[in-house]
Amino acid sequence: MEGMTQRLEAMLAKGTDNMLLRFSLGKAYAEQDCFREAETHLRAALAFDPAYSVAWKWLGKACLGQGDKAGARAAWESGLQAAQARGDQQVVKELQVFIKRLDKEAAAGG
């Protein structure tokens, strides 16, 4: 996976900058538990397309990975709105589950 992030970072350094590149970098960094880097690239991806619900999903994971539950909730709620607007039912279901987990943790005092 690190080889992929290096290749993607090289593309970015050469001047390529678009939603798919930033999303791919953000997702790859999140999968490596490099959440701060993931957040940076996912926010950049969303600047290109704020309706891209999957980027919101991964941004929430990156925020949660940094201990930012409020940021995760905000990202997932934005993603939920985007997914509902696009009719992306799978992402809607996933985000509803993530939000419910946060609610359960909050109710349990976590």
Where are these regions (language model features)?
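Structural marker of alpha-solenoid helical repeat scaffolds
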Residues: K14, F48, G65, A82-R86
